[in-house]
Amino acid sequence: MAGSSQRTASKLEFLEGSRSGIRYDPDQLRGTDPADGRTLLARYDLASARDSLTLEAIAARRAGLWRWEELLPVRRRSSITTLGEGATPLLPPARLASKLGLRGLFIKAESVNPTGSFKARGMAVAVSRAVELGADHLVAPSAGNAGGALAAYAAAAGVRATVVMPADAPIANQQEAALCGARVILLDGLISDCGKLARLIAELSGAFDMATLREPYRVEGKKTLGFELAEDFDWALPDAVVYPTGGGTGLVGMWKAFDELQALGLIGAARPRMYAVQADGCAPIVRAFEEGSEFAEPWPHAVTRAAGIRVPSALGDHLILDCLRRSGGGAIAVPEVEIDAMQTFAAREGAGYLSLESSAALAALPFMLERGLIGADERVALFDTGAGFKSEAPSMERPAVVSNDPGAWPDVIASLNDAKVPDPRRPI
C-alpha cells in the first residue's frame, strides 16, 4: 500500500493479559504476558470507534482487511504492508450442500487470499505492526501456510524472516517460504518442536517470535474473519460456525470480533455456535472439551495428513475452549480416512479443490447433522482455510498418456462413455 506518515484511525488503547488481566503499553514490541506467559490481547477505545464505524461508513470503504482500521493496531499508514488480503467470498456450494442434506451451508473461501490461505490475514497485520515497532527479523514455526505468509509479508516489508517447519511439511509450503526469501529450517519433529527451536532462535538472535498467539497481533488480523462474516450475512450472524482447528487463532479472533461488533452496536447479542474440528489422530481440543478441562493436555504421537491441524499443543487452548463453551458449540474429531474421502467428494460435487484441513471440517458435517448439533435448515458457515494444492497431494492414479496417432483417438473418445460416475453418497 502506498503510504505516508499519516496516522491511521486505529483506536488501540492497551494490551491485556488474556488470563492475568494486566494492562501493558501497546507501543512497545511485546510477545506473551510477562505475568504468566499466556497470550496478550489488543484492546480498543470502542466508544470512540463507534463514531466512525457505522454501517454506512463501512459500506463506502474499499473492500479488504484494512477497511476495519479503527479496530486494527497499526498506527501509521506508511507501516501497512498489504498484498490485497481479505474480502474473501462467501459461497453457497449448492450441489455439495444438497448431498450433505444442509440447505443453509456456506463456505468462506479463504483460499483466494494472496498466499492461498487465511494465514495472510494474520501475517499482514502482525508483520505490519512488528515492523512499525522496530522488528527487523521475524521468526515463526509453521506447519506450512503460516510460514509462506510470513515470508511473503516480510519480503513486502523489507525485513528478514526465518521459518522453522517439520521436515514433512508440504513441499508447496516449503517452496513458497524459500522463494519469498525466508531462511527455511526443516526440523525432524512436530510443530511443537519447531516452536521450541523458533523461541531459541528469537532468544539468541534477537528475532521477534511470530508464533501463533505468542504475539498480540496475528489474532487481530484473523478477527477480520468475524467482521466479514457479519457483513456477509447482512449483520445477522449464522447459526453455527464450523472451523478446522490447530492453533485456534481464527476461532479466538472471530469471537473477539463478535464482542467488538456488539459493543459498536453493529450486531446484537446473538452468537453462532462455534465448533472446532480436529483429526482423530491429533485432537487435544476435542479431548479437553469432552473432559470439561480448562486447558488441553499435549497430544502424544500426533498424526494426520492435514498439516495445519496437526498441532499437539496450542498456547491459546483456554481461549479456544472458552469460546466453544460460551457459544454453546463443541469440538468434533473426524477419522483420517473421512478427511481424504471428503476432499475428493467435495471437489466432484463442485466445491473446488479444498485443503485437507477444510475437508476435515466438511467431513464433520454429516456427524453433526446426525447428532443434532446443526439443523438441515440452519445457516452454517464453514471455513475453507486454504487451497488444496498447498496440502499434501492426494493418492491418485496418474491419467494415462494417449498416443498422438489420430487413428487411436476414436477408441479414446469411445471410452469416455464407459467412464464411471463418481459415487454421490456421503463419505460418512
At which residue positions do the language-model features occur?
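PLP-dependent amino-acid enzyme catalytic core
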Residues: 1-428
